[in-house]
Curated annotation (Swiss-Prot):
Organism expressing this protein natively: Thermosynechococcus vestitus (strain NIES-2133 / IAM M-273 / BP-1)
HAMAP family: Porphobil_deam (MF_00260)
Protein's job: Tetrapolymerization of the monopyrrole PBG into the hydroxymethylbilane pre-uroporphyrinogen in several discrete steps.
Entry-linked Pfam families: Porphobil_deam (PF01379), Porphobil_deamC (PF03900)
Protein name (Swiss-Prot/TrEMBL): Porphobilinogen deaminase
Length: 320
């Protein structure tokens, strides 16, 4: 069923607190731009929400947090979906498109310290300090730069992770700046990690709005939320990831910046143990963002990324 002005536009969202905060922000923005329309949020649980005791890399990541939202749109039950862009696969199902990318929150990673480590930075933590992270990307980079630290998997929503930190299960956590700020935990950030030690995930800090490809009405509504600079940066990042066939199973990091119409993309592929790290940058016109991403991926493949990727896929790809 196509949305009409006579009924509410239905926005699909995961049920998690962060997802709802993000979706309700999109709902409010759409309402501001389109006062003659009504918007309602429809929540649902995704496969990724139900798997809390297994590292995501062990179960694959093709739509773990998006598939149910996408099926709902394809069935005509909802009209659009709001995703953390980093969770949205680079290949979308037939009939769906990435309609808009919103203005990005700081995409960097943050160090969140337990109380007894207050005043430290990542560089001053002593040997054996236990760092919680569920991301292979963060893990590989930090193992590379800080081999003396101890890393331990952590799952659960943001509140759960912070509670585990405060209970002493970890000495520190590595979390996304964006998620912490959106949920009102910005004061827990001990250090924003520099790009020199932690390139961020593709799309981190941005929201992606997905809808049906043929739904011209919804496409037009959603376009009003698009942020051109964020879009160019994220399209370059997603093209880079698509060429590498990566996801949360693979330690792939990026960093993008736009100055004077020129986009500089830095990309990284690391081995799981952090021993090998292939990293390089390219600069080009903003209008060629996706081409730039593809070119950088091919450049990294030539420098050894393909061998690293093959080893990782052989190790962590889930059984079909």
């Amino acid at each position: 069923m196509i949305a009409t002005s006579s009924r509410p536009v239905r926005i699909g969202s995961r049920k998690s607190q962060l997802a709802l905060v993000q979706t309700e922000w999109v709902q409010a923005q759409l309402q501001t731009h389109h006062r003659d329309r009504a918007f309602e949020v429809v929540t649902m649980t995704t496969q990724g929400d139900n798997i809390l005791d297994v590292a995501l890399a062990k179960i694959g990541d093709k739509g773990l947090f998006t598939k149910e939202l996408e099926l709902s749109m394809l069935r005509g039950e909802t009209d659009l979906a709001v995703h953390s862009l980093k969770d949205l696969p680079t290949q979308l199902p037939d009939g769906l498109v990435l309609a808009a990318i919103t203005e990005r929150e700081d995409p960097a990673d943050a160090l969140v310290l337990g109380a007894k480590w207050t005043g430290h930075t990542i560089d001053t933590l002593p040997e054996g300090t236990v760092i919680g992270t569920s991301s292979l990307r963060r893990l590989a980079q930090l193992r590379h730069y800080y081999p003396h630290l101890t890393f331990k998997d952590v799952r659960g929503n943001l509140n759960t992770r912070l509670a585990k930190l405060d209970a002493g299960e970890y000495d520190a956590l590595i979390l996304a700046v964006a998620g912490l700020r959106r949920l009102g935990f910005g004061d827990r950030i001990s250090q924003v990690l520099p790009a020199t030690v932690s390139l961020y995930a593709v799309g981190q800090g941005a929201l992606g709005i997905e809808c049906r490809a043929e739904d011209a009405d919804i496409l037009a509504l959603v376009k009003t939320l698009e942020h051109p600079e964020t879009t160019a940066r994220c399209l370059a990042e997603r093209a880079f990831l698509r060429q590498l066939e990566g996801g949360c199973q693979v330690p792939i990091g990026v960093h993008t910046v736009i100055e004077n119409g020129q986009l500089t993309l830095t990309g990284l592929v690391a081995s799981l143990d952090g021993q090998r790290l292939v990293k390089d940058s390219l600069t080009g016109d903003v209008a060629t963002a996706e081409e730039l991403g593809t070119r950088l991926a091919l450049k990294l493949r030539e420098q050894g990324a393909s061998e690293i990727l093959e080893e990782i896929f052989a190790t962590v790809r889930p059984e079909r």
